[in-house]
Amino acid sequence: MLTDLLSRHKQEFLPGLHTELRAQCSRTRGVSFVSGNLMGNTRQDTSGVCCRVYKNGVYGFSSAAEYDDENVKNVIRAAGENAEFMDSRVRKGRPAFPAIPYSSRMTDAHINEVSQKTYIDYLKALDDYIVGKYPNLASRTLMMREDSMEKLLVTSDGVDSHFAAPRSYIYVILSALTPAGVPVELFKAYGGRGSFDMNFSDPAELYGEIDRLYESVMKKREGVYADAGVKTVILGSELAGMIAHEAVGHTVEADLVLGGSVAGPNLGKQVASPIVSLTDFANEAFGETAPLPVYVDDEGTPAVDAPLIKDGILVGYMNSRETAERFGMKPQGNARAFAFSDEPLIRMRNTAVHPGKDKIEDMIASIDDGYYLVNTNNGQADTTGEFMFGVTEGYEIKHGKLGRAILDTTVSGVAFEMLKTVDMISDKVEWTSSGFCGKKQPMPVGMGGPEMRCKIMIGGR
């Protein structure tokens, strides 16, 4: 864990200027098998220190790849000089940020080192199980990834934070051939918050999950193409989370609002069905710890929930301290940086649609001709809210019952229009948190939601 070398250098901050001093250690561990062959075996650690100084509307930033007292002094000095230089040239003349009351947050997470052999042996046991029980698969891929970001932060406002965020996942991809000889595959991630040894102890614990994934692949190999057009569908939790993050979340990040996103003219207006609410959660959601909790952001702002849509009305944005001043809002802890050499950007944390009151069985029974879209493997949206997502697992709904699996397809639409068609929401939320958001810097995020019944454009053959 990082040793605090920062606190002793607070007296070197330039008087009267907002200063953020951050040390960081980021680590990744990875192993991958493809059809029984070890294809990847990696370990990486990066660490360093950075400082950012705000003066009259401009920032000075400096970072160093070695974390020691000399480099701490150097980045404080260089960031201050850069801020002074920028201010002398740009002269924005903006006021100082309101002070954040003193706060201290010490980490309660632990990062436990595990040998690469442990990762390899675990995946090898899973691979042996798959090939022994399911020899008819066309291919199989297993990957393990563990990563963590540990940060020490002190600011001129008196914020003092030490935070560690380890997470670990195993990814399984199973592929089979259709009767026509065309490969189809399904992907599933297992794991979550915590080091590898906290989430995975016995490979046999995943055998049941792999069995269920295999059964789904076998259904998909007999699948049919969806009928193209606007259909009544049930979006599974993964797709609801993708909508929340990609199609809505990015449009309500305040820096993108300033860039002209669709959320700008829609603040305070109806953008979804009255039964839809959506929040970017800081560290707790629906009575439980969020998948990737954030307690203090990299500007030193204490993290609190950011309500975005309430009862169908767009009620807020996600902000940095600077954009919060611009919009007359309160910062809620959304400014985060990926590496020690990165400046904080407005980022999502754990973004989800709130659960409703409906049972998934009743939702399926309510549809005479439609689809249940379970999983997605990719998606993109622009700042107008227009989106297109891939669907890798889905099923027909015929006369209120689940039917045949469907082959890979896509769904598309405009978020604020599609969300107005939501008329049923299930009472259970599921999360995904195994990937990264790619907005300029990669960033671990959580996203999720309940199943939602809506109308959406679906692709066909």
Regions found by a protein language model. Name each.
Residues M1-R461:
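N-terminal small-residue-enriched
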